[in-house]
Amino acid sequence: MLAADKKKKVIDKFKTHATDTGSPQVQIAILTEEVKDLTEHLRGHKKDFSSRRGLIKKVGERRRLMKYLKREDQKAYDDLMAKLKI
C-alpha cells in the first residue's frame, strides 16, 4: 500500500483529466509503484511469503490492466510504457 502523499503524486503525474483517479493509466502507475516498493521490501525480507504473494497478485493485476489498455488504446499504452520505463 502506498502512502497517501506518494499515491497523490503518482495520480497527478498520470491522470488524463482533472478529476481522474481510476483510469487504467493511473491504476497501472499506482500498481507499478507498489510493485517497486514490495520488490525492495522483499530484497531485505526474503522469507516474507505473504508479501511475496501480494507482489504476485499486484503484478498479475497490472498485467491484466496493461493488456486491456493495449487492446483499447495502443497510443496511450505506448506513452505509458515509455513514461514508466517498463
Which residues does each PLM region occupy?
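Extended, charge-rich alpha-helical interface modules
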Residues: M1-I86
